[in-house]
């Protein structure tokens, strides 16, 4: 046991948390689709209890969209990706803002949800191009 404690350490480096197969923009897309569906249900229901629950769930799902996008932005994409796709930073910034308080988290706008899904689709296309490389 002591030999292990005092053994020289070995430094290791990893490209990402685990092999890159764990990353997928589909997670953000599924949550964004849920947000859009909830917005539609909100518009069709006047029950205050239902609306309260729906808003809470919509806000939680919007946070999950941001989380999944941030993981891709900070853990999967690396400097060579940003060099090849210089629009990536802007896409992620715009998408996370659309999922935030000024977008689907704070408002119930189908237009915001559609814009968010479009940004996620753009990110997804780039993601899959990088996976092919």
Q: PLM features: residue spans?
A:
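Alpha-helical segments in soluble extracytoplasmic regions
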Residues: 53-69
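N-terminal intrinsically disordered, cationic/polar leader segments
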Residues: 1-51, 81, 86-122, 126, ...
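Short, mixed-charge, low-aromatic patches
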Residues: 48-56, 73-76
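Short, solvent-exposed, charged loop/turn and helix-capping segments
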Residues: 68-85
């Amino acid at each position: 046991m002591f030999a292990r404690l005092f053994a020289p350490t070995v430094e290791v480096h990893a490209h990402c948390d685990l092999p890159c197969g764990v990353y997928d923009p589909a997670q953000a897309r599924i949550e964004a689709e849920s947000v859009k569906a909830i917005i539609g249900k909100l518009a069709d229901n006047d029950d205050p209890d239902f609306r309260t629950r729906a808003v809470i769930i919509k806000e939680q799902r919007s946070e999950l969209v941001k989380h999944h996008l941030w993981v891709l932005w900070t853990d999967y994409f690396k400097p060579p990706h940003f060099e090849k796709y210089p629009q990536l930073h802007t896409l992620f910034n715009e998408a996370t803002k659309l999922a935030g308080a000024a977008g689907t988290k704070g408002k119930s706008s189908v237009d915001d949800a559609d814009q968010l899904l479009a940004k996620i689709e753009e990110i997804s296309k780039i993601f899959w191009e990088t996976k092919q490389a």
